[in-house]
Design a protein with these regions (language model features):
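Hydrophobic, small-residue-rich membrane helices and short re-entrant helix-turn-helix hairpins
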Residues: 29, 33-37, 143-145, 205-237, ...
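Loop-to-transmembrane helix boundary motifs in multi-pass membrane proteins
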Residues: 85-86, 122-125, 233, 237, ...
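Juxtamembrane transmembrane-helix boundary signature
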Residues: 22, 49-83, 91-101
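Hydrophobic alpha-helical segments and their helix-loop junctions in multi-pass secondary transporters
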Residues: 153-181, 191-212, 370-379, 404-416
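Transmembrane alpha-helical segments of multi-pass small-molecule transport proteins
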Residues: 92-93, 116-137, 158, 325-339, ...
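Extracellular loop-to-transmembrane helix junctions
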Residues: 7-10, 37-62, 76, 80, ...
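Flexible loop linkers connecting adjacent transmembrane helices
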Residues: 34-39, 62-87, 142, 256-272, ...
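Extracellular/periplasmic helix-exit of transmembrane alpha-helices
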Residues: 58-70, 215, 236-266
Length: 416
Protein backbone atom coordinates (compact mmCIF):
# COMPACT_ATOMS: atom_id res chain seq x y z
CA UNK A 1 0.00 0.00 0.00
CA UNK A 2 2.75 2.47 1.01
CA UNK A 3 4.75 1.63 -2.11
CA UNK A 4 1.76 2.45 -4.32
CA UNK A 5 1.19 5.78 -2.54
CA UNK A 6 4.90 6.61 -2.68
CA UNK A 7 4.88 6.10 -6.46
CA UNK A 8 1.82 8.37 -6.75
CA UNK A 9 3.43 11.08 -4.61
CA UNK A 10 6.69 10.93 -6.60
CA UNK A 11 4.75 11.12 -9.87
CA UNK A 12 2.83 14.17 -8.62
CA UNK A 13 6.08 15.88 -7.56
CA UNK A 14 7.57 15.06 -10.98
CA UNK A 15 4.79 16.86 -12.87
CA UNK A 16 4.25 19.58 -10.22
CA UNK A 17 4.91 22.97 -11.70
CA UNK A 18 2.82 24.23 -14.64
CA UNK A 19 -0.60 24.14 -12.92
CA UNK A 20 0.63 25.31 -9.52
CA UNK A 21 2.80 28.10 -10.97
CA UNK A 22 0.17 29.33 -13.43
CA UNK A 23 -2.60 29.48 -10.85
CA UNK A 24 -0.45 31.24 -8.25
CA UNK A 25 1.04 33.88 -10.54
CA UNK A 26 -2.61 34.81 -11.01
CA UNK A 27 -2.28 36.60 -7.64
CA UNK A 28 -0.06 39.24 -9.21
CA UNK A 29 0.17 42.97 -8.46
CA UNK A 30 -3.05 43.73 -10.34
CA UNK A 31 -4.79 40.82 -8.64
CA UNK A 32 -3.67 41.92 -5.19
CA UNK A 33 -4.84 45.47 -5.95
CA UNK A 34 -8.22 44.18 -7.13
CA UNK A 35 -8.71 41.91 -4.11
CA UNK A 36 -7.50 44.67 -1.76
CA UNK A 37 -9.91 47.12 -3.38
CA UNK A 38 -12.75 44.61 -3.06
CA UNK A 39 -12.12 44.20 0.67
CA UNK A 40 -11.39 47.86 1.41
CA UNK A 41 -14.41 49.24 -0.45
CA UNK A 42 -17.02 46.49 -0.07
CA UNK A 43 -15.95 44.57 3.02
CA UNK A 44 -16.85 40.90 2.87
CA UNK A 45 -19.61 41.33 0.26
CA UNK A 46 -17.53 40.06 -2.69
CA UNK A 47 -16.32 36.90 -0.94
CA UNK A 48 -19.26 34.98 -2.44
CA UNK A 49 -17.44 35.09 -5.79
CA UNK A 50 -14.59 32.88 -4.53
CA UNK A 51 -16.35 29.50 -4.58
CA UNK A 52 -17.79 29.71 -8.14
CA UNK A 53 -14.57 31.32 -9.40
CA UNK A 54 -12.47 28.49 -7.92
CA UNK A 55 -14.66 25.87 -9.60
CA UNK A 56 -14.51 27.75 -12.91
CA UNK A 57 -10.72 28.20 -12.60
CA UNK A 58 -10.19 24.47 -12.03
CA UNK A 59 -12.38 23.58 -15.02
CA UNK A 60 -10.76 26.08 -17.41
CA UNK A 61 -7.19 25.27 -16.32
CA UNK A 62 -7.85 21.53 -16.49
CA UNK A 63 -9.12 21.86 -20.06
CA UNK A 64 -5.89 23.58 -21.08
CA UNK A 65 -3.72 21.02 -19.34
CA UNK A 66 -5.66 18.17 -20.98
CA UNK A 67 -5.37 19.70 -24.46
CA UNK A 68 -1.64 20.18 -23.96
CA UNK A 69 -1.08 16.58 -22.86
CA UNK A 70 -3.28 14.97 -25.54
CA UNK A 71 -2.29 17.11 -28.56
CA UNK A 72 1.28 18.01 -27.59
CA UNK A 73 0.60 21.53 -28.88
CA UNK A 74 0.12 24.95 -27.29
CA UNK A 75 -3.26 26.71 -27.31
CA UNK A 76 -2.32 29.44 -29.81
CA UNK A 77 -0.77 26.76 -32.05
CA UNK A 78 -4.08 24.86 -32.06
CA UNK A 79 -6.08 28.05 -32.68
CA UNK A 80 -3.92 28.86 -35.72
CA UNK A 81 -4.26 25.34 -37.14
CA UNK A 82 -8.00 25.06 -36.58
CA UNK A 83 -9.26 28.65 -37.10
CA UNK A 84 -6.70 30.20 -39.44
CA UNK A 85 -3.94 32.78 -39.31
CA UNK A 86 -6.19 35.88 -39.55
CA UNK A 87 -8.18 35.15 -36.38
CA UNK A 88 -4.99 34.10 -34.61
CA UNK A 89 -3.24 37.34 -35.55
CA UNK A 90 -6.12 39.49 -34.23
CA UNK A 91 -6.24 37.47 -31.00
CA UNK A 92 -2.45 37.77 -30.56
CA UNK A 93 -2.58 41.56 -31.01
CA UNK A 94 -5.36 41.84 -28.40
CA UNK A 95 -3.45 39.59 -26.02
CA UNK A 96 -0.22 41.57 -26.39
CA UNK A 97 -2.08 44.84 -25.64
CA UNK A 98 -3.82 43.38 -22.57
CA UNK A 99 -0.64 41.70 -21.34
CA UNK A 100 1.37 44.89 -21.79
CA UNK A 101 -0.95 46.65 -19.34
CA UNK A 102 -0.52 43.65 -17.03
CA UNK A 103 3.29 43.89 -17.23
CA UNK A 104 3.12 47.61 -16.40
CA UNK A 105 0.98 46.69 -13.39
CA UNK A 106 3.63 44.24 -12.14
CA UNK A 107 6.32 46.92 -12.20
CA UNK A 108 3.90 49.27 -10.41
CA UNK A 109 3.68 46.58 -7.73
CA UNK A 110 7.47 46.25 -7.53
CA UNK A 111 7.88 50.02 -7.23
CA UNK A 112 5.11 50.35 -4.65
CA UNK A 113 6.20 47.46 -2.44
CA UNK A 114 9.86 48.56 -2.26
CA UNK A 115 8.84 52.21 -1.81
CA UNK A 116 7.34 51.07 1.51
CA UNK A 117 10.91 50.26 2.53
CA UNK A 118 12.15 53.64 1.20
CA UNK A 119 13.60 52.36 -2.10
CA UNK A 120 12.88 54.72 -5.01
CA UNK A 121 11.31 53.30 -8.16
CA UNK A 122 14.27 54.60 -10.19
CA UNK A 123 16.39 51.97 -8.44
CA UNK A 124 13.90 49.15 -7.80
CA UNK A 125 12.29 48.97 -11.25
CA UNK A 126 15.46 48.87 -13.44
CA UNK A 127 17.17 46.43 -11.05
CA UNK A 128 14.20 44.04 -10.94
CA UNK A 129 13.67 44.31 -14.71
CA UNK A 130 17.28 43.24 -15.26
CA UNK A 131 16.92 40.47 -12.68
CA UNK A 132 13.84 38.84 -14.23
CA UNK A 133 15.34 39.14 -17.73
CA UNK A 134 18.59 37.49 -16.66
CA UNK A 135 16.80 34.74 -14.69
CA UNK A 136 14.87 33.55 -17.74
CA UNK A 137 17.26 34.34 -20.60
CA UNK A 138 20.33 32.87 -18.86
CA UNK A 139 18.51 29.99 -17.18
CA UNK A 140 16.87 26.79 -18.43
CA UNK A 141 13.41 25.32 -17.98
CA UNK A 142 14.18 23.24 -14.88
CA UNK A 143 16.05 25.96 -12.97
CA UNK A 144 13.46 28.60 -13.90
CA UNK A 145 10.58 26.35 -12.82
CA UNK A 146 12.24 25.67 -9.43
CA UNK A 147 12.54 29.42 -8.79
CA UNK A 148 8.89 29.92 -9.74
CA UNK A 149 7.76 27.07 -7.45
CA UNK A 150 9.58 28.64 -4.48
CA UNK A 151 7.98 32.01 -5.30
CA UNK A 152 4.55 30.32 -5.34
CA UNK A 153 4.99 29.04 -1.78
CA UNK A 154 5.79 32.58 -0.51
CA UNK A 155 2.13 33.54 -1.13
CA UNK A 156 1.39 31.95 2.24
CA UNK A 157 2.44 35.35 3.68
CA UNK A 158 -1.03 36.66 2.78
CA UNK A 159 -2.70 33.93 4.82
CA UNK A 160 -0.70 35.04 7.87
CA UNK A 161 -1.54 38.71 7.12
CA UNK A 162 -5.23 37.79 7.00
CA UNK A 163 -5.05 36.05 10.37
CA UNK A 164 -3.14 38.95 11.96
CA UNK A 165 -5.84 41.39 10.81
CA UNK A 166 -8.23 39.71 13.30
CA UNK A 167 -11.33 39.55 11.08
CA UNK A 168 -14.80 38.44 12.07
CA UNK A 169 -14.48 34.82 10.93
CA UNK A 170 -18.23 34.27 11.26
CA UNK A 171 -19.06 37.23 8.99
CA UNK A 172 -16.35 36.30 6.48
CA UNK A 173 -17.41 32.66 6.20
CA UNK A 174 -21.10 33.60 5.99
CA UNK A 175 -20.38 36.10 3.19
CA UNK A 176 -18.49 33.37 1.31
CA UNK A 177 -21.55 31.13 1.06
CA UNK A 178 -24.31 33.77 0.94
CA UNK A 179 -25.13 36.39 -1.69
CA UNK A 180 -25.16 39.99 -0.41
CA UNK A 181 -28.43 41.86 -0.18
CA UNK A 182 -29.36 45.49 -0.56
CA UNK A 183 -27.96 48.35 -2.59
CA UNK A 184 -24.64 46.77 -3.66
CA UNK A 185 -26.33 45.28 -6.73
CA UNK A 186 -27.23 48.79 -7.94
CA UNK A 187 -23.67 50.06 -7.49
CA UNK A 188 -21.86 50.37 -10.87
CA UNK A 189 -18.45 50.15 -9.23
CA UNK A 190 -19.49 46.97 -7.40
CA UNK A 191 -20.15 45.31 -10.76
CA UNK A 192 -16.93 46.78 -12.17
CA UNK A 193 -14.96 45.37 -9.24
CA UNK A 194 -16.70 41.99 -9.53
CA UNK A 195 -15.64 41.75 -13.20
CA UNK A 196 -12.13 42.73 -12.15
CA UNK A 197 -12.12 39.90 -9.58
CA UNK A 198 -13.20 37.40 -12.25
CA UNK A 199 -10.73 38.83 -14.79
CA UNK A 200 -7.79 38.70 -12.42
CA UNK A 201 -8.65 35.20 -11.14
CA UNK A 202 -9.14 33.58 -14.56
CA UNK A 203 -6.92 35.68 -16.83
CA UNK A 204 -6.72 34.86 -20.57
CA UNK A 205 -2.91 34.70 -20.64
CA UNK A 206 -2.93 31.92 -17.99
CA UNK A 207 -4.53 29.43 -20.36
CA UNK A 208 -1.91 29.98 -23.05
CA UNK A 209 0.98 29.80 -20.60
CA UNK A 210 -0.26 26.67 -18.84
CA UNK A 211 -0.73 24.71 -22.06
CA UNK A 212 2.68 25.80 -23.38
CA UNK A 213 4.33 24.79 -20.09
CA UNK A 214 2.63 21.38 -20.16
CA UNK A 215 3.90 20.82 -23.71
CA UNK A 216 7.43 22.00 -22.92
CA UNK A 217 7.58 19.75 -19.85
CA UNK A 218 6.63 16.79 -22.04
CA UNK A 219 3.93 15.33 -19.77
CA UNK A 220 2.49 12.11 -21.23
CA UNK A 221 -1.17 11.05 -21.32
CA UNK A 222 -0.54 8.19 -18.87
CA UNK A 223 0.80 10.72 -16.32
CA UNK A 224 -2.11 13.11 -16.75
CA UNK A 225 -3.80 12.20 -13.44
CA UNK A 226 -0.93 13.75 -11.50
CA UNK A 227 -0.93 16.79 -13.79
CA UNK A 228 -4.65 17.29 -13.18
CA UNK A 229 -3.99 17.18 -9.42
CA UNK A 230 -1.31 19.85 -9.94
CA UNK A 231 -3.95 22.10 -11.56
CA UNK A 232 -6.53 21.47 -8.81
CA UNK A 233 -4.08 22.08 -5.94
CA UNK A 234 -2.74 25.24 -7.60
CA UNK A 235 -6.21 26.65 -8.30
CA UNK A 236 -7.45 25.95 -4.77
CA UNK A 237 -4.34 27.43 -3.13
CA UNK A 238 -4.42 30.62 -5.22
CA UNK A 239 -8.06 31.33 -4.35
CA UNK A 240 -7.48 30.63 -0.65
CA UNK A 241 -4.76 33.30 -0.82
CA UNK A 242 -7.15 35.66 -2.66
CA UNK A 243 -9.81 35.05 0.02
CA UNK A 244 -7.38 36.03 2.79
CA UNK A 245 -6.34 39.21 0.93
CA UNK A 246 -9.98 40.34 0.73
CA UNK A 247 -10.53 39.40 4.38
CA UNK A 248 -7.40 41.24 5.57
CA UNK A 249 -8.45 44.49 3.86
CA UNK A 250 -12.11 44.14 4.88
CA UNK A 251 -11.14 43.63 8.54
CA UNK A 252 -8.87 46.67 8.61
CA UNK A 253 -9.47 49.25 5.88
CA UNK A 254 -13.23 48.73 5.39
CA UNK A 255 -14.03 48.44 9.10
CA UNK A 256 -12.19 51.71 9.79
CA UNK A 257 -13.92 53.52 6.91
CA UNK A 258 -10.86 54.01 4.71
CA UNK A 259 -12.70 52.95 1.56
CA UNK A 260 -11.05 52.84 -1.85
CA UNK A 261 -7.29 52.55 -2.28
CA UNK A 262 -5.15 53.55 -5.25
CA UNK A 263 -2.34 51.02 -5.09
CA UNK A 264 -1.89 47.62 -3.45
CA UNK A 265 1.00 49.14 -1.47
CA UNK A 266 -1.51 51.61 0.04
CA UNK A 267 -3.26 48.62 1.64
CA UNK A 268 -0.04 47.50 3.33
CA UNK A 269 0.71 51.02 4.56
CA UNK A 270 -2.81 51.61 5.89
CA UNK A 271 -2.79 48.20 7.56
CA UNK A 272 0.28 48.99 9.69
CA UNK A 273 -1.39 51.05 12.45
CA UNK A 274 -4.47 48.80 12.40
CA UNK A 275 -2.99 45.29 12.36
CA UNK A 276 0.63 45.88 13.40
CA UNK A 277 4.10 45.75 11.87
CA UNK A 278 4.03 42.02 11.16
CA UNK A 279 0.90 42.28 9.00
CA UNK A 280 2.44 45.28 7.20
CA UNK A 281 5.72 43.44 6.48
CA UNK A 282 3.95 40.26 5.34
CA UNK A 283 1.58 42.18 3.06
CA UNK A 284 4.39 44.32 1.58
CA UNK A 285 6.73 41.34 1.12
CA UNK A 286 3.91 39.32 -0.45
CA UNK A 287 3.25 42.16 -2.90
CA UNK A 288 6.93 42.35 -3.88
CA UNK A 289 7.14 38.58 -4.38
CA UNK A 290 3.91 38.50 -6.41
CA UNK A 291 4.96 41.43 -8.61
CA UNK A 292 8.46 40.09 -9.29
CA UNK A 293 7.08 36.61 -9.94
CA UNK A 294 4.47 37.87 -12.41
CA UNK A 295 6.92 40.29 -14.06
CA UNK A 296 8.86 37.16 -15.04
CA UNK A 297 5.90 35.00 -16.07
CA UNK A 298 3.69 37.48 -17.96
CA UNK A 299 6.22 38.54 -20.63
CA UNK A 300 7.31 34.90 -20.88
CA UNK A 301 3.71 33.77 -21.36
CA UNK A 302 3.15 36.42 -24.04
CA UNK A 303 6.32 35.47 -25.91
CA UNK A 304 5.33 31.78 -25.84
CA UNK A 305 1.81 32.52 -27.02
CA UNK A 306 2.69 34.85 -29.90
CA UNK A 307 5.52 32.63 -31.16
CA UNK A 308 3.31 29.55 -31.14
CA UNK A 309 0.44 31.39 -32.80
CA UNK A 310 2.60 32.88 -35.55
CA UNK A 311 4.83 29.84 -36.05
CA UNK A 312 8.10 31.14 -34.57
CA UNK A 313 10.53 29.07 -32.49
CA UNK A 314 10.06 29.48 -28.73
CA UNK A 315 11.22 28.08 -25.38
CA UNK A 316 13.60 28.93 -22.54
CA UNK A 317 15.67 25.85 -23.38
CA UNK A 318 16.52 27.40 -26.76
CA UNK A 319 19.22 30.05 -27.10
CA UNK A 320 18.90 33.56 -28.57
CA UNK A 321 19.99 32.46 -32.06
CA UNK A 322 17.50 29.58 -32.16
CA UNK A 323 14.50 31.67 -30.98
CA UNK A 324 15.29 35.36 -31.64
CA UNK A 325 11.67 36.58 -31.90
CA UNK A 326 10.78 34.81 -28.65
CA UNK A 327 13.58 36.51 -26.70
CA UNK A 328 13.16 39.91 -28.37
CA UNK A 329 9.44 40.03 -27.54
CA UNK A 330 10.16 38.94 -23.96
CA UNK A 331 12.82 41.65 -23.67
CA UNK A 332 10.67 44.40 -25.21
CA UNK A 333 7.74 43.70 -22.88
CA UNK A 334 10.00 43.92 -19.83
CA UNK A 335 11.78 47.07 -21.04
CA UNK A 336 8.50 48.68 -22.16
CA UNK A 337 6.71 47.86 -18.91
CA UNK A 338 9.56 49.14 -16.75
CA UNK A 339 10.02 52.29 -18.87
CA UNK A 340 6.30 53.14 -18.64
CA UNK A 341 6.42 53.02 -14.84
CA UNK A 342 9.52 55.23 -14.77
CA UNK A 343 8.20 57.74 -17.33
CA UNK A 344 4.70 58.40 -16.01
CA UNK A 345 3.66 59.93 -12.67
CA UNK A 346 2.18 57.51 -10.15
CA UNK A 347 -1.24 59.17 -10.34
CA UNK A 348 -1.62 58.04 -13.97
CA UNK A 349 -0.39 54.49 -13.45
CA UNK A 350 -3.41 53.41 -11.43
CA UNK A 351 -5.45 53.48 -14.66
CA UNK A 352 -3.24 50.72 -16.07
CA UNK A 353 -3.68 48.58 -12.97
CA UNK A 354 -7.49 48.57 -12.87
CA UNK A 355 -7.96 48.63 -16.65
CA UNK A 356 -5.69 45.61 -17.13
CA UNK A 357 -7.87 43.44 -14.89
CA UNK A 358 -11.11 44.54 -16.57
CA UNK A 359 -9.58 43.92 -20.02
CA UNK A 360 -8.70 40.42 -18.82
CA UNK A 361 -12.35 39.90 -17.92
CA UNK A 362 -13.58 41.20 -21.29
CA UNK A 363 -11.16 39.04 -23.32
CA UNK A 364 -11.69 35.91 -21.20
CA UNK A 365 -14.98 34.70 -22.81
CA UNK A 366 -13.40 34.84 -26.29
CA UNK A 367 -10.55 32.59 -25.17
CA UNK A 368 -12.82 30.15 -23.31
CA UNK A 369 -15.18 29.84 -26.30
CA UNK A 370 -12.25 29.02 -28.62
CA UNK A 371 -11.02 26.46 -26.08
CA UNK A 372 -14.46 24.85 -25.91
CA UNK A 373 -14.70 24.58 -29.69
CA UNK A 374 -11.30 22.86 -29.73
CA UNK A 375 -11.67 20.50 -26.77
CA UNK A 376 -15.04 19.16 -27.96
CA UNK A 377 -13.62 18.01 -31.31
CA UNK A 378 -13.43 14.22 -31.29
CA UNK A 379 -10.90 14.16 -34.14
CA UNK A 380 -8.58 16.32 -32.01
CA UNK A 381 -9.16 14.98 -28.48
CA UNK A 382 -10.59 11.49 -29.04
CA UNK A 383 -11.90 9.99 -25.80
CA UNK A 384 -10.42 12.94 -23.86
CA UNK A 385 -12.93 15.50 -25.12
CA UNK A 386 -15.03 17.44 -22.60
CA UNK A 387 -17.72 15.85 -20.45
CA UNK A 388 -21.19 17.48 -20.44
CA UNK A 389 -20.62 18.80 -16.88
CA UNK A 390 -17.33 20.46 -17.85
CA UNK A 391 -19.07 22.07 -20.85
CA UNK A 392 -21.90 23.43 -18.68
CA UNK A 393 -19.45 25.04 -16.22
CA UNK A 394 -17.19 26.48 -18.95
CA UNK A 395 -20.05 27.83 -21.09
CA UNK A 396 -21.72 29.17 -17.95
CA UNK A 397 -18.54 31.02 -16.97
CA UNK A 398 -18.35 32.63 -20.41
CA UNK A 399 -22.00 33.68 -20.45
CA UNK A 400 -21.86 35.09 -16.90
CA UNK A 401 -18.75 37.17 -17.68
CA UNK A 402 -20.31 38.41 -20.94
CA UNK A 403 -23.50 39.34 -19.07
CA UNK A 404 -21.59 41.16 -16.32
CA UNK A 405 -19.57 43.06 -18.91
CA UNK A 406 -22.71 44.14 -20.78
CA UNK A 407 -24.33 45.33 -17.53
CA UNK A 408 -21.19 47.26 -16.61
CA UNK A 409 -20.92 48.94 -20.04
CA UNK A 410 -24.63 49.81 -20.01
CA UNK A 411 -24.27 51.32 -16.55
CA UNK A 412 -21.35 53.47 -17.70
CA UNK A 413 -23.29 55.00 -20.59
CA UNK A 414 -24.53 58.59 -20.08
CA UNK A 415 -27.90 58.72 -18.36
CA UNK A 416 -27.56 55.33 -16.63
Amino acid sequence: MWKRWRIRILLFLAVLGPGFITANVDNDSGGILTYSQAGAQYGYTLLWTMIPITIALIVVQEMCARMGVVTGKGLSDLIREEFGLRLTFVLMVLLVVVNYTNVVTEFIGIAGSLHLFHVTKFISVPFCAALVWFMVVRGNYKSTEKIFLVASVVYIAYIFAGVLSQPSWHDALLATVKLPQGSVWRDKMYMYTAIGVVGTTIAPWMQFYLQSSIVEKGIRVKDYGASRLDVIVGSFFTDVVAWFIVVACAATLFVHGMGAIQFASDAAEAMRPLAGDYAFILFAFGLFNASLFAASILPLSTAYTVCEGMGFESGVDKNFKEAPFFYWLYTLLIVGGAATVLALPDSQLINFAILSQVLNGVLLPVVIILMLLLINRKDLMGKHKNSPLWNVIAWGTSLIVIGMTMVMLWGMMPGH
